[in-house]
Design a protein with these regions (language model features):
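Helix-to-loop junction immediately C-terminal to a conserved catalytic motif
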Residues: 73
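Conserved ABC transporter NBD signature motif
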Residues: 81-92
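Conserved ABC ATPase signature
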Residues: 156-164
Length: 232
């Protein structure tokens, strides 16, 4: 299992079939002790994100945007309140359940991307693809062509521009099965043309999987047809 830029092994099943089941996320009075919470649509509220819907969360610097995303992904646990996926508290997941959940139910693009700097772009993507066996290598190359990064695939990540790295991270996130996609400022270093290309590809994959999208950003945007917008 790939978590950020670390690899963990999980038990292999004889048949690792991909099933896209719906998932509802519920936040119950979620709060971060070290954050000054003022007027927020999320913190210390009861909020539900419905399966298959797209949500935009506008957040200023220092309001806990990345902390929220990391809490939803289960790597930030310094909070009060509850994060529920289909009514199950993620703090109560066993190690095996967490690995299976991250491998088949939830995918993420971190703000800092968490790519392997010394690996090529292709290797970074293929680690996720090979671990989950969701898409063929041909499909991965098709995504790279769509996002205009085919020419970067055999280059080390450390030689790529940040915008190119963001597109590689997006492709990597799409290489696994998921019912929830978390995007933390995914387009911050992309121009409008490349944002349109990336958002089109993401929207196609969301529709295919009937997946929920949670996107955080510093500003409002209309990259997707959002069902609801929040201010953090």
């Amino acid at each position: 299992l790939l978590i950020g830029n670390k690899i963990y092994k999980r038990k292999q099943k004889k048949q690792d079939k991909i099933t896209f089941t719906t998932m509802i996320i519920t936040l119950q009075k979620l709060n971060i002790p070290f954050l000054p919470i003022l007027d927020s649509d999320i913190w210390n509220k009861h909020v539900s994100f419905k399966a298959g819907n797209k949500y935009h969360i506008k957040a200023s610097s220092g309001s806990g945007k990345s902390t929220l995303i990391q809490s939803l992904y289960g790597i930030q646990k310094n909070y009060t309140g509850d994060v529920l996926f289909n009514q199950k508290n993620i703090k109560q997941f066993s190690v095996e359940e967490t690995c299976e959940w991250r491998a088949s139910k939830i995918s993420i693009v971190f703000q800092d991307l968490k790519l392997f700097e010394d690996k090529t772009a292709l290797e970074n993507i293929d680690i996720k693809r090979a671990l989950t066996n969701t898409y063929t290598s041909e499909k991965m190359h098709e995504f790279a062509e769509q996002l205009g990064v085919s020419h970067t695939l055999n280059r080390p990540i450390q030689t790529l521009s940040y915008g190119e790295r963001q597109r590689i991270a997006i492709i990597r996130a799409l290489m696994q099965p998921f019912t929830v996609l978390l995007l933390d400022e995914p387009f911050s270093h992309l121009d409008q043309h490349n944002i349109q290309l990336a958002s089109k590809l993401i929207a196609q994959e969301l529709q295919l999987r009937n997946a929920t999208l949670l996107l955080t950003d510093l500003e409002d945007d209309n990259h997707f047809q959002y069902h609801q917008k929040f201010s953090l």
